[in-house]
Amino acid sequence: MQLNSTEISDLIKQRIEKFNVVTEARNEGTIVSVSDGIINIHGLADVMQGEMIELPGGRYALALNLNRDSVGAVVMGPYADLQEGMKVTGTGRILEVPVGPELLGRVVNTLGEPIDGKGPIEAKLTSPVEVIAPGVIDRKSVDQPVQTGYKSVDSMIPIGRGQRELIIGDRQTGKTAMAIDAIINQKDSGIFSIYVAIGQKASTIANVVRKLEEHGALANTIVVVASASESAALQYLAPYSGCAMGEYFRDRGEDALIVYDDLSKQAVAYRQISLLLKRPPGREAFPGDVFYLHSRLLERAARVSEAYVERFTNGEVTGKTGSLTALPIIETQAGDVSAFVPTNVISITDGQIFLQTELFTAGVRPAVDPGISVSRVGGSAQTKIIKKLSGGIRTALAQYRELAAFAQFSSDLDDATKKQLDHGEKVTELMKQKQYAPMSVFDQALVIFAAEKGYLKDVELAKLADFEEALLSYARGQFADLAKEIDTSGAWNNEIEAQFVKLVEDFKATQTW
């Protein structure tokens, strides 16, 4: 078959017309070094701080060091098979995680992927993990309580919705137990909970999830896990992921509580990443921006105004404030609260609950030290009845500690001192509480009332726990309406006081202690 020149030119023209040119610009680079989960990339032109970089095999790395001729990125996941010369691509996206009510009752990893074997999560929305905290104008003052269910905390160190209250202490002093009990106490309060586990053993986390499920609190809780076996990058990012999930509720006029367990391990993970990225070390080998690491996280816990919620939801939610309350946990070494990370977090938060090893081993649990534990903004959020009744509790405990130390050197004490010691001893005993047994407002108020009004003078110290249990059981049976009213309103007036007096006196008349 022979073609003349005209036919050949026509065929070429047809082919040219039909030829579909697809141009796709890809921001591509090459891995030049891989070590300890850190990759250096050459050739990526436009990269943002914190951008997701796509790696071979569907994995991602996070761009953290932006140098003149290279990019330092930390791999999120396994990195053993990455090699020099591999091609990587910039995505132009900041890390986002799924958010929304679909995550409640689930256990997820740092990236929001389910790890509980209950199937995929059909979340409709995603949110960036790094968000600027609400400004001063967008905030409201903290004046609504978060009941932890602990007598010692709710009476002496009250926590409000939108507050940041640090739980600090040595290892094995009950920090996680306190945070888990606070979450369990929210199951009927309308507050959603997020528990972020950072650098813990998988067995410990599994135990926490099981306890939440047993006590019916998992259904309104999201558990975010970055266990000890996961990379430093995922441990560093886990609190920000959990915070983004909590902000979903805050920004829509709901209330949420987030526990970071614990930020010491997050700081260590960030130190590891920073040193591998060859950033200059500072005090205790932490990088210079370790304060900013925690401040930008904890400032996102806030109570936001009605106008902020209305603006965020485009008018769908009106007249409601939202809040995110944070309970960060810090582990100290031999009670040293003056170390770098503890002092940073103490200065960022609105107060701290200090748990002491000496108290814990002496059987005072929760091991709260009332001397150096404080809540800077929770007082205005405290329930009215608890605020009215608990004024003398902290004083009684402080005086008792002082006198107990003095009494060791003196055998003959006057009657007033003996009374103070006896009262302080009984208040200390009364503040003890079992794990997984948070108390309602009414129960706390009744026990504190009995202590403050002198109804425990004739009760032996050894029988105090039985007295408390019997009193609460009697009150729930005979004064159910009063209990319901106080649990709902938290009010205090002369009429309620008279009913309390009648309740305790009737109880003491029926039984001998």
Swiss-Prot record:
F-type ATPases have 2 components, CF(1) - the catalytic core - and CF(0) - the membrane proton channel. CF(1) has five subunits: alpha(3), beta(3), gamma(1), delta(1), epsilon(1). CF(0) has three main subunits: a(1), b(2) and c(9-12). The alpha and beta chains form an alternating ring which encloses part of the gamma chain. CF(1) is attached to CF(0) by a central stalk formed by the gamma and epsilon chains, while a peripheral stalk is formed by the delta and b chains. ATP binds at G169, D170, R171, Q172, T173, G174, K175, T176. Keywords: ATP synthesis, ATP-binding, Cell inner membrane, Cell membrane, CF(1), Hydrogen ion transport, Ion transport, Membrane, Nucleotide-binding, Translocase, Transport. Its main location: membrane. It catalyses: ATP + H2O + 4 H(+)(in) = ADP + phosphate + 5 H(+)(out). This is ATP synthase subunit alpha. NCBIfam families: atpA, PRK13343.1.
